[in-house]
Curated annotation (Swiss-Prot):
GO terms for cellular component: membrane. Its main location: membrane. Heme binds at residue 430. The gene is PchP450. GO terms for biological process: conidiogenone biosynthetic process. Belongs to the cytochrome P450 family. It comes from Penicillium rubens (strain ATCC 28089 / DSM 1075 / NRRL 1951 / Wisconsin 54-1255). This is Conidiogenone synthase PchP450.
Amino acid sequence: MLLLWFGFFSFVCGLVIYRLQFHPLSKFPGPKLAALTSLYEFYYNVVLGGRYLWEIERMHEQYGPIVRITPHELHVADPNFYTEIYAGPTRRRDKDPRLVRLAGQPTSMFATVDHGLHSSRRAILNNYFSKRSIAGLEDMIQGKVQKLVKRLNIACDQGTVVQLDAASSALTADIISEYAHGVSLDYLDDVNFNNEVADSILSLASVVHVLKFFPFLLDLSKFIPDKVLENLWSHAANILRLQKLVRAQADVALQNGGKVNGQATMFGALCDPSLPAQERTLDRLQDEGFSLIGGGTETTTGTLKVIMFHLLNEKALLRKLRKELEESPSGTWAELEKLPYMRGVMNEGLRLSGVITRLPRRAPDEALRYKQWTIPPNSLMSTSSHFVHTNSDLFPDPLVFDPERWIRAEAAGQRLEHMIVTFSKGSRQCMGNHLALAELYLVISTLVREFDMDLYGVTADNIVTHREYGFGVPKERGGGLRVSISRVRTP
């Protein structure tokens, strides 16, 4: 026993000496405890609950723009270095395998570690999500928006309170499922907008940091019978049911040349016979199909939630946007993008929402230079959109929702829109950015034109980011964006 304790003590001492003196990142600034052990991150993200991002912010205030935040990871809080970390397709950037496995869809594009394999998988779907292709979807998107309008008109007649973020989640889920899978989920038909699915995604996100440190829990959950899992954790069971539905649709597509109900789908591209056999399996189609629903609903809804809260919380902003919309001859996506104040509202919403977690990358083929520092090849490095979007040099009073900052920047010749990184940048930029923007422009303009709304028991604590669970989570999570609603009175 004494020998075992001596061996353990020797191992710990050796590890401490290596990480502080001989590790490739040992010369970079940062807290010694963070360099020694990931328990530093564990404390802030697991014990305190999603608070490490703000501890990293404090580190940068103390140590400067580049900091060693874990034994194996550097964090850079310089907006000008963002495109070095998240570089274009000609420069290889691999993901961290320990992080992407948390997605639970191991063969999806999002979970693909290798740069080359990701590029080939992305190329298959690029055309489906190009701006031109999404513009061709406008009639379908408008149809779903009008379906939402009908539901909201019923709420006006009945005097019921609407949970606007649940309605948005239903809308975006119906759009992406019909476009990608050929069959709409029809969440807009559900009396509660199928709110349990959105709630389940948020509930699972709340344990993402636990799973990062104990990834075997994710593997174990796959062996728990559905009935048992439903009793233990209904949110996980809801996600499993949706996965099974996507799998069934993918199976139909595989058996019918990529078509579902006779309609061409994204699955058709994924099971093209020219692809290698391992790239057109049922598991692969399920993973990609489910990943699109997960990625295409809650992030878009989060932006809508931020925008509508600020418009309703400060009605002068709402009145200014409504006036601009009333003076616009058209409500098409292309025309809405040209409206200066509307564009400012959208940019502020994107700036104050979205995925804010660190997205680590490795540059296996090159050493990167940042000021006097050389980042060794294959080192984990990251930043967060939070540090770009709240940079006071770029965005004075960064926590203030100020649509006119974009109008002022344009008048001054500043290309401030290039600093919006909500969808990330580079070769792994979110593929669904054009779809998300089309949805947001069309639904927000419709809501502002047609309805008067008032916040119902909602404060900034229900909206403003306080914790990081992948995306930003507010201090008070219950209830969502609840509003009382009535039709706009025409003069």
